[in-house]
Amino acid sequence: MDIAIIGASGYAGGDLIRLLLTHKEADIVCATSRKLAGTPVTKDHIHLKNLIDLEYTNPDVENIDADFAFLAVPHTAAMQYAGKLKERGIKTVDFSADYRLPREIYEKTYGVKHSDYFKAPYGIPELHRNEVKNASFVANPGCFPTGATLAAAPVAKLAHTIIYDSKSGVSGAGDSISETTHFPNVAENILPYKITAHRHLPEMRQEAAFLGSKANVYFTPHLLPAIRGIITTAHILFNEPMELEMIQKLYQDFYKNEPFVRLQPAKLGGVRGSNFCDINFELENDGTRLVAVSAIDNLVKGAAGQAVQNMNIMCGFDEAEGIRMPGMFP
């Protein structure tokens, strides 16, 4: 199947190429970049040297000849291409936030008017597999909402409050140079940011509601002195005391058939470079608070890997094709 990657020069685009090179059904025929058009893909993705022989082109959607497309462009840019890809019948997974939320919530959260809105399934396969299976366009979730939602999903509807505390590697901020991600500011430091108003919070609230939860949902992110990975600690407060055996059964039943969720101690070293989400939890003695911890690689399960997982479901491939690999440890 011929694949086009629109916006392939960023970190997520590079990881997408890395994964697709091992996918037996995928052939990357187009990789676009406005700033690098005419140069080899390996000019900035040096780790792919000798593995791909392709030059970047300008993102001209009308002339893309592919069976499937990945939109890996920034928020507000994806809406320029999404409708055209749909019109041409090219199945697509979109990495941006442009189609993750209802129009009014998106416009309030991102401060822009949506120029080409349509509804799309929200691509956490563990929650929305059937919608993804029948879709021609899927909105790939944000990295923070992926790890957070999976941590709490089995018990979300039993909670009155869910508080997510996430810590992320700096690659989540993208490859643009900024003071926030400047080495002296990040090294040997942990930086909370957007403490009460991160733009991924509406996605977390949306998915909690989808799971039947009426809980108040809160979120605070922190920046880690690491390249990859997100550790999320979910404080889940229940309406009434719970028994540990019941909690264990809820998690085991919810994830028993999920190829990329593992119930084991959540550590960045266990998932780095992989599409796995590792989850463990402890129940407070009085049974009213569950602390669930999840670990994902923000560029894989939080971006490129989940996008490939969604593509596999949309196209009827083995769901794990191209992303069946362990984490890199040590």
Curated annotation (Swiss-Prot):
GO molecular function terms listed in the Swiss-Prot or TrEMBL record:
N-acetyl-gamma-glutamyl-phosphate reductase activity; NAD binding; NADP+ binding
A single Gene Ontology CC term: cytoplasm
What positions constitute the catalytic site? C143
Localisation per UniProt entry: Cytoplasm
Q: In which pathway does it act?
A: Amino-acid biosynthesis; L-arginine biosynthesis; N(2)-acetyl-L-ornithine from L-glutamate: step 3/4
Task: Name the principal localization, coarsely classed.
Answer: cytoplasm
User: What InterPro entries would the database entry show?
Assistant: AGPR_AS, AGPR_type-1, NAD(P)-bd_dom_sf, NAGSA_dehydrogenase, Semialdehyde_DH_NAD-bd
Explain the purpose of this protein. Catalyzes the NADPH-dependent reduction of N-acetyl-5-glutamyl phosphate to yield N-acetyl-L-glutamate 5-semialdehyde.
Protein family according to the UniProt entry: Belongs to the NAGSA dehydrogenase family. Type 1 subfamily.
Task: Please report a single Pfam family linked to this protein.
Answer: Semialdhyde_dhC_1
Q: Which GO terms fall under biological process for this protein? A: L-arginine biosynthetic process
Q: What's the protein name?
A: N-acetyl-gamma-glutamyl-phosphate reductase
UniProt cross-references to SMART domains, sorted A to Z: Semialdhyde_dh
The yes or no answer to whether the keyword Cell membrane is present is: no
* Keywords annotated in UniProt: Amino-acid biosynthesis, Arginine biosynthesis, Cytoplasm, NADP, Oxidoreductase
Q: Which NCBIfam families match?
A: argC
Q: PANTHER family this protein is in? A: N-ACETYL-GAMMA-GLUTAMYL-PHOSPHATE REDUCTASE, CHLOROPLASTIC-RELATED (PTHR32338:SF10), N-ACETYL-GAMMA-GLUTAMYL-PHOSPHATE REDUCTASE, CHLOROPLASTIC-RELATED-RELATED (PTHR32338)
- Give the E.C. number(s): 1.2.1.38
Q: Which reactions are catalysed by this chain?
A: N-acetyl-L-glutamate 5-semialdehyde + phosphate + NADP(+) = N-acetyl-L-glutamyl 5-phosphate + NADPH + H(+)
Q: What class of enzyme is it?
A: oxidoreductase
